[in-house]
Structures are given as structure tokens and as C-alpha cells.
């Protein structure tokens, strides 16, 4: 019955998106100011200082969540700037639930059970009114605060719920969590994470998930039998990052890369269905489809709501897609003629590995980066693969950057939405953050500039009284491997959320509709429909 509910609710969500598009097709353009330095912080006696610097999460209703502080710090921006503060004064802000911007957590008093924060980390906003955030509690040793993550869920009008806490009993075990690492989260608010428990070294690691409103449960644990093999799970986490190989799709599928051991240690990718069934999708040593070779290593997987996977091998020599209908299918491989281009897909370029960190949208569209080789010249590029596997280049190093008189110099990680629109950050002229920008495709696949360093951005939503500020630096959450919580600033409507710092030292969070179908203000007309969808999700336990 749960599967029927999930299918029906997914269909209803699609109808909601279609209704918004049908009513508002063609209404594009404009930038909405969500929060800005000096703006009153709702529900407090403070004003915003630094806003959104650690990334902005955007849902499919155009709502955002981010970290902000009432204070300012002077520091130099490099590539991914984040202030180091003398005091802990960060807070979590969200627009989830359609109630406007509000603060839901802050460093200091305010956690369930009268606990206090030592620090908070960037939040994720779901499509159904949930904001999920994490951080460490006061009293946890500073040396362990990185691993002593506590995951909490906020819903408008409800008391915050602790999803998992350092020191609590880990489900399906009799031991407590020693460490909880940054979670992977989907658009429905489902959560999956790596954790360590107080147990022997061969039973230390595990993966837990909370799916479809059900209780948190164990997905896999070190030392248990590894399905699809004759061995046991050996390693379930990644050295240092711990979470770059774990993903959860909007259908509740959990995909992860790990290692198993029989007579030797081998890597594999496993997929857990929403019902908890776990299967090995590909193992080192398996024949690699479309080649005469076997997998020597497998890269971290990406998963969508249909349980489809996209992944490369660890050396970035090829890219595959998996679905229950087709099995494993080769998308692209090193040495292959790049379609429509006078070059071949090449081996890894310095700092730009071919087929790195693919993105996979809800509609089955994939996005990936590739190095291209023509003669002795290597260039970077961004590609789109449609659900049938057809490839099309979106951008290339040295090609004109739309909206500028310059060319692309290098690219950030790309992301793709359910329509197949791609968005990415890139630099022009040189590698300076002063020549950084965001580009995205419109509904016709035409690449358009969203915002660039040096632009004059009107931060006042009232066009009658413009307030133009020059962008010095900006950032965009692409949901790549170093943000494997899958926080993204690009939604299925084509809206782009971003952080900008201006030459006057102020900063803000903004949502652009340059390539979107509807204006977010027009979504209000469909508010009752959206609320009914959210209400139905709650009643069915989602």
C-alpha cells in the first residue's frame, strides 16, 4: 500500500508542477531577494550580517534554506569562502511551508530537550515543508564535533524531531552511535547517512536511512553478509569524506559504494529499495558493458526517484547508467568520438577528470564533465545525456561564454533537473573568482547567463526603487561530491538560488527566474493545491 501511496503522491506532485507551468508558461525573468545584509531578520531584534555563505538549498516550490549570521567578518575570498568567527552566532533559516522566512535553529539555546548548539551546518529544504539540518550539541568535545553530528527535522507548526543523535542507540543494534556523518537527503525529506557505533572494529560502520515517514532503520552494516556476493561488508565509508559515495533518490532508493571481503577485498555498488531489499548492481571484476574489459574499480553512484543510477569507474574512463529495465548501459567511454565535436573523449585532464561526478535528474537526464582531445590539445567540456543515451555538448573550454565578451576557462560541477536543463558555475578570462559566473539552459536548451561577478544586481524587489550593487563573488550549490547531502540551488522549475557578495561588503541570498517557467510569486495562486499536497503527504506518513 505504501508503494501505491508513493506512486500516487508522486503523480500528484507532477500534476502540481504541470499546473504551475500551464498557468504561468512564459512568465520568466527577475531575481528575488530572499535575505540581505542589513535587512531585518524576521522574528528577531537583529539584522542580517553575513547571509548564505555556506550554500543555499532550493526546493521545487522556489523556497530556500541557508545559514546566516548577524555579524560580519573581514576576510579574503578564495574559491569557496567561509568565515572563521570569533563567536558562534550562526543560525538556520528556511522558507519551508510557505510561511515566509523564519529562523528555526541557532547556536546557543533552542534545541529539543533544552540542548544547545555548539555549531550548526547548512540545511536542506524538502518539497513537503520539512527543513533538515545538522550540527553538534554543546558539551560534545571540540575534537569530535565534526563526527558528532546530530540530524534534526523541522516542520512548520511542529516541534523539531531528532532523526539521529550522537550517543543514541543505533536502530537494529544494541550499541550507541559514536559518530554520525553528514547525511544525504532527497526532495521528500528522506535521510540516509554513514555512522560509526561503539562496537568491535569489524562491526563499527553502518548505513541508516529514514524513508517514507517510517522509523530510522539499518540499511547495511560492516561484517554482515553482502548481498550479491559470497562475502561480508568490509568498508561502507570513504576515507576522510565518509559520505561522498552515498546517495538517496526521491523514491527512497539508497545507493552506496562500499567494499566486501571473501578471499580478498573488492569494491561494489549496492542499491536498497524503499522496502529495504538490498542488491549489488556492479562489482569489481564484473564485465563492463560495452567494453571487452572488467571493472577494476567503481565510482560513487548517483540515484534518482526511479531507482536509476549513473556512475563512472574510479579512474574516470567511462560512464554507465543502470535501470531495472535496461540493466547496465554504457553512456560514454574514453577514446570514443565525441558526438558533434571534432575531438575524442580523453583521459583525465589535470584537475578535471573525465566523466567526473555525474548528475542524474528525476526524468532520467544525466550531466557530466569530460576532457576532449584534438591532436595534442586537451579542453574541458560539459555534456548532457538524455534518457535514451543521446549525447550533446553544452559548453566547452575556449568557447564564448554567453552574456560576456569572454570565453569559458574552466567549469564547476554541473547539475540537471527533471526537464533535462543543466546549470553550472564557470570562470572566464582567468582562474580568479572575480571572473566567476553561473549559467543555465532555458526550456529550449539555450545556455543563458544567470549572474556573473561584475554584474550590477538590483537587490530591491520593488522595481520603482532599484538598489544596484556590484557582485564581487558568488557561489551556487551544485550538489556535487563535496556536497553529497545533495543540496542544490537548481530546481525542476528552472529556478537558480545563489549567494552573492558585493563590493560594498554586503551579501545576500537570491533566486533567479531567468530560465524558469513560472514566476514564484504566481505560485501563490496555486497555494491551496500545494498545501493539500503537503497535507496529504503528512497523513500518509511521508
Where do the protein language model's features map onto the residues?
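Bacterial N-terminal signal peptides that target proteins for export
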Residues: 1-9, 520, 537
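Bacterial N-terminal signal peptides
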Residues: 9-22
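Short, charged juxtamembrane terminal tails flanking transmembrane helices
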Residues: 538-542
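Conserved "turn/edge" positions that cap or connect secondary-structure elements
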Residues: 24-516
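Sec-dependent N-terminal signal peptides
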Residues: 7-12, 526-529
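A short, hydrophobic C-terminal helix/tail in secreted or cell-surface proteins
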Residues: 518-536
Amino acid at each position: 500500500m505504501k508503494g501505491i501511496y508513493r506512486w500516487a503522491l508522486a503523480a500528484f506532485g507532477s500534476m502540481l508542477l504541470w499546473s504551475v507551468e500551464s498557468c504561468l508558461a512564459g512568465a520568466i525573468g527577475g531575481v528575488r531577494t530572499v535575505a540581505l545584509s542589513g535587512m531585518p531578520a524576521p522574528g528577531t531584534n537583529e539584522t542580517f550580517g553575513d547571509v548564505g555563505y555556506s550554500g543555499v538549498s532550493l526546493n521545487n516550490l522556489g523556497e530556500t534554506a541557508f545559514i546566516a549570521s548577524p555579524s560580519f567578518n573581514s576576510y579574503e575570498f578564495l574559491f569557496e569562502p567561509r568565515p572563521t568567527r570569533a563567536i558562534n552566532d550562526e543560525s538556520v533559516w528556511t522558507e519551508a511551508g510557505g510561511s515566509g522566512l523564519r529562523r528555526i535553529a541557532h547556536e546557543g539555546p533552542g534545541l529539543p530537550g533544552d540542548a544547545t548548539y555548539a555549531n550548526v551546518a547548512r540545511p536542506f529544504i524538502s518539497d513537503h515543508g520539512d527543513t533538515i539540518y545538522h550540527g553538534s550539541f554543546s558539551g560534545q568535545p571540540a575534537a569530535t564535533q565534526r563526527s558528532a553530528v546530530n540530524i534534526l527535522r523541522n516542520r512548520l507548526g511542529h516541534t523539531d524531531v531528532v532523526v539521529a543523535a550522537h550517543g543514541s542507540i543505533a536502530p537494529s543494534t544494541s550499541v550507541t552511535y559514536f559518530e554520525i556523518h553528514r547525511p544525504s537527503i532527497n526532495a521528500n525529506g528522506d535521510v540516509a547517512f554513514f555512522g560509526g557505533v561503539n562496537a568491535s572494529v569489524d562491526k563499527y560502520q553502518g548505513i541508516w536511512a529514514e524513508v517514507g515517514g517510517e522509523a530510522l532503520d539499518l540499511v547495511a552494516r560492516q561484517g554482515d553478509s553482502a548481498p550479491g556476493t559470497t562475502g561480508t561488508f568490509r568498508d561502507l565509508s570513504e576515507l576522510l569524506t565518509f559520505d561522498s559515495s552515498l546517495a538517496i533518490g526521491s523514491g527512497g532508493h539508497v545507493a552506496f559504494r562500499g567494499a566486501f571481503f571473501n578471499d580478498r577485498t573488492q569494491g561494489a555498488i549496492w542499491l536498497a529499495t524503499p522496502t529495504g531489499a538490498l542488491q549489488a548492481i556492479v562489482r569489481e571484476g564484473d564485465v563492463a558493458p560495452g567494453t571487452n574489459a572488467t571493472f577494476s574499480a567503481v565510482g560513487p553512484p548517483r540515484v534518482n526517484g526511479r531507482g536509476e543510477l549513473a556512475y563512472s569507474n574510479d579512474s574516470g574512463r567511462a560512464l554507465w547508467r543502470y535501470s531495472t529495465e535496461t540493466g547496465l548501459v554504457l553512456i560514454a567511454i574514453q577514446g570514443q568520438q565525441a558526438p558533434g565535436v571534432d575531438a575524442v573523449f580523453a583521459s583525465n585532464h589535470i584537475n578535471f577528470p573525465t566523466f567526473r561526478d555525474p548528475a542524474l535528474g528525476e526524468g532520467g537526464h544525466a550531466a557530466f564533465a569530460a576532457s576532449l582531445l584534438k591532436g595534442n590539445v586537451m579542453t574541458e567540456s560539459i555534456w548532457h545525456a538524455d534518457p535514451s543515451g543521446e549525447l550533446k555538448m553544452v559548453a566547452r573550454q575556449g568557447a564564448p561564454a554567453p552574456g560576456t565578451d569572454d570565453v569559458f576557462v574552466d567549469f564547476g560541477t554541473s547539475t540537471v533537473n527533471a526537464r533535462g536543463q543543466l546549470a553550472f558555475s564557470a570562470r572566464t578570462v582567468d582562474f580568479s573568482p572575480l571572473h566567476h559566473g553561473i549559467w543555465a539552459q532555458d526550456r529550449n536548451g539555450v545556455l543563458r547567463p544567470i549572474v556573473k561577478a561584475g554584474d550590477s544586481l538590483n537587490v530591491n524587489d520593488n522595481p520603482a526603487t532599484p538598489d544596484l550593487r556590484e557582485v564581487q563573488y558568488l557561489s551556487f550549490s551544485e550538489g556535487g561530491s563535496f556536497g553529497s547531502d545533495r543540496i542544490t540551488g537548481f530546481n525542476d522549475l528552472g529556478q537558480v538560488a545563489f549567494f552573492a557578495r558585493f563590493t560594498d561588503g554586503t551579501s545576500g541570498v537570491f533566486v533567479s527566474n531567468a530560465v524558469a517557467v513560472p514566476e514564484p510569486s504566481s505560485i501563490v495562486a496555486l497555494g491551496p493545491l500545494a498545501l493539500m499536497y503537503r497535507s496529504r503527504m503528512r497523513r500518509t506518513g511521508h
